[in-house]
Curated annotation (Swiss-Prot):
This is Major capsid protein. GO terms for molecular function: structural molecule activity. Pfam families: Capsid_N, Capsid_NCLDV. Keywords: Capsid protein, Late protein, T=147 icosahedral capsid protein, Virion. Homotrimer. One of its GO terms (cellular component) is T=147 icosahedral capsid. It is found in: Virion. Its main location: virion. It comes from the Viruses. It comes from Invertebrate iridescent virus 6. Major capsid protein that self assembles to form an icosahedral capsid with a T=147 symmetry. Represents around 50% of the total virion protein mass. Belongs to the NCLDV major capsid protein family. InterPro entries: Capsid_N, MCP_C, MCP_C_sf, VP_dsDNA_II.
Length: 467
């Protein structure tokens, strides 16, 4: 039996190996001593979450609603939307009878949002939609937080798995739930670009929401259908559900930093420019691989583009919006297979990006946009099928400029997404039974961009020195 041993004396042998390469890497006046830590002091502050209680409109399905940003704190660090979704009971009189199953769509909190924006005296400083929320979550949510994020936005079995007519003692099919959506505005990315609310006394600051109708979010399935039969539930005492769902307790929360009196006095003393991020969404296009498997779409963006995000969305069923594959979900009596293994593939085979009459990217495979580019330039690689990104930045999630291209200076910008064989099968509806492709699928092409811009804080108001 051997006995493990080691002693300090052997370490001096390592120290004695210092030569020319080591002289290049170690020593000198600017070298770091790893065993004597220097404390980097910070200004004195505290932080506190605050509910933004001043609101206009109704925080309900299909409505517009806005919350006023309070100036009670000095800096707004981040915000999130919190809502309570109601319980839903599938009636025994539903159109599919015992074969009826009800569920909410995947990414409920994403798809609740038609558009969200932040305004300063009606000047829109930033906006995003549910497409960007899908892209942003796919490429930036680390694996260690993915389960928690899914819980926040409603991706839990009790809400998105098919539920039958309740059997006593149960009284509801889908339970009531409190859900949260982190709002990915520019000031939430880093405390160094926090919104200086105390320095903006002359701005009426609002976070504005346009919510989708519940019909886009609630799904009634027929588990006995040969081809998936998904419909919007009908409201009525002897129909599918007794009453239309209503949101409750819609609230925007903000996390504020409160600083010292000295720092607060300095906030409004000089002009301050802040590099921020904005989101742009190009008009959506119908994508039909049976008539044109390589369509050419114009994309018109402006400012310094850090990254492009694009996908082909499966639009076969309007109330299943977060589906970017070649197949519809397959429903069984107890579960929904969101990405059936025999049918759910990437609709795009390869993509060409063109501008200035030059192929910037020529016939690049989807594996590059879904795997290789995110591996090097994004915080994470999507776990779901169908997401693509191209980053001009070394790391598009970094606040500091690390690469971009000014699309406002380019002409004739277009993108050509070429259909995969699976997309053609899906569009024709010739897939095998249980594949989600055994009936015709419809699609649309979506492309969004992340860009940099500059905001200026001056004279107690916010503006854009470069529009």
């Amino acid at each position: 039996m051997s006995i493990s041993s080691s002693n300090v004396t052997s370490g001096f042998i390592d120290i004695a190996t210092k030569d020319e390469i080591e002289k290049y890497m170690y020593g000198g006046k600017t070298s770091t001593a790893y065993f004597v830590r220097e404390t980097r002091k910070a200004t004195w502050f505290t932080q506190v979450p605050v509910s933004l209680t001043r609101a206009n409109g109704s925080a309900n399905f299909g409505s517009e609603w806005s919350a006023s940003i309070s100036r009670a704190g000095d800096y707004l660090l981040y915000t999130w939307l919190r809502v309570r979704i109601p319980s839903v009971t599938l009636l025994s009189t539903n159109q599919f009878g015992a074969n009826g199953r009800i569920r909410w769509c995947r990414n409920f909190m994403h798809n609740l949002i038609r558009e969200c924006s932040i305004t300063f005296n009606d000047l829109v400083a930033a906006r995003f939609d549910h497409y960007h929320l899908d892209f942003w979550a796919a490429f930036t949510t680390p694996a260690s937080k993915a389960v928690g994020y899914d819980n926040m936005i409603g991706n839990v079995s009790a809400l998105i798995q098919p539920q039958p007519v309740p059997v006593a003692p149960a009284t509801v099919s889908l339970p009531e739930a409190d859900l949260n959506l982190p709002l990915p505005f520019f000031f939430s990315r880093d405390s160094g670009v926090a919104l200086p609310t105390a320095a903006l006394p002359y701005n009426e600051m609002r976070i504005n929401f346009q919510f989708h109708d519940w019909q886009r979010l609630l799904i009634l399935d027929n588990i006995a259908a040969v081809a998936s039969q998904t419909v919007v539930p009908v409201v009525g005492a002897t129909s599918d559900i007794a009453t239309a769902p209503v949101l409750h307790h819609g609230t925007v929360w903000g996390n504020y930093a409160i600083v010292s009196n000295e720092e607060r006095r300095r906030m409004g003393c000089s002009v301050r420019d802040i590099l921020v991020e904005q989101v742009q969404t190009a008009p959506r296009h119908v994508w039909n691989p049976t008539t044109n498997d390589a369509p050419n779409y114009d994309i018109r963006f402006s400012h310094a583009i850090k990254a492009l995000f694009f996908a082909v969305r499966n639009t076969t069923f309007s109330n299943q919006p977060s589906n970017y594959t070649t197949a519809s979900p397959v429903i069984t009596s107890t579960t929904v297979i969101l990405e059936p293994s025999t049918g759910a593939f990437d609709p795009i085979h390869h993509t060409t990006l063109i501008y200035e009459n030059t192929n910037r990217l020529n016939h690049m495979g989807s594996d590059y946009f879904s795997l290789v580019n995110p591996w090097y330039h994004a915080p994470t690689i999507p776990g779901l099928t169908g997401f693509h990104e191209y980053s001009y930045s070394l790391a598009f999630n970094e606040i500091d400029p690390m690469g971009s291209t000014n699309y406002g200076k380019l002409t004739n910008i277009s993108i050509v997404p070429t259909a995969s064989p699976a997309a053609k099968v899906g569009a024709a509806g010739t897939g095998p039974a249980g594949s989600g492709q055994n009936f015709p699928q419809t699609f649309e092409f979506i492309v969004t961009a992340l860009n940099n811009n500059i905001i200026r804080i001056s004279g107690g108001a916010l503006g854009f020195p470069v529009l």
